[in-house]
Amino acid sequence: MDRDEELTLENLKLCRSIIDPIIDKYDGRIFYTAGDSVIADFESPVSSVNAAIEFQKTILKRNNTIKNDFKLVWRVGIHLDDVIIEGNNIFGTGVNIAARLEAACSPGQILISGAVKEQVINKINTNIADAGTKVLKNISSSYQTFGISPSGEDIVKTNAKEYANNKKIKSYKPKLAV
């Protein structure tokens, strides 16, 4: 295996050792993982947003300690919708929309739909900024989206800016759709 691939795999495992317990802490259930992507379901939008904020902050702290290795910068899409659960699988338009929101994110960003914003706006301590209307691949409607920054700390811009401006960083953009 190429050294970069080995290092990436080690870093991915380390990030998952951070992310998975946080998802569990907020009563989330991981349904699917493939390489650098995770699909999880939560009992409430508040839980999903709090989990995303906590792990983005934790991953950012981790990345700030890495000098010449790979940094993994995650993107998170969160949507609220009905889903179908069969055994260990999760299906439905809601899953697709969350995945498309994640794909529309900048590295380090948490992007939520308007439905999620309405549920969390007065229930969590965070900054929520209008991120514009997005046309999502293979989704018939466009969606109003919002970016989240934890407690006044602009994690969205910090991670994305670091990723864009630091040419020395070899970074991959793992994904989490909830």
Where are these regions (language model features)?
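Catalytic beta-strand-to-alpha-helix segment of the class III nucleotidyl cyclase homology domain
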Residues: 39-142, 149
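N-terminal intrinsically disordered, acidic low-complexity segments at the extreme N-terminus
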Residues: 138-165
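Acidic, proline/glycine-rich low-complexity intrinsically disordered segments
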Residues: 164-178
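Catalytic NTP-binding/metal-coordinating core of nucleotidyl cyclase/transferase enzymes
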Residues: 1-51, 58
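Bimodal feature
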Residues: 14, 76, 152-155
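Short, flexible hinge/linker loops that cap or flank conserved catalytic cores
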Residues: 32, 68-70, 169-172
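Short beta-strand/turn micro-motifs at beta-sheet edges
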Residues: 25-28, 65-66, 165-167
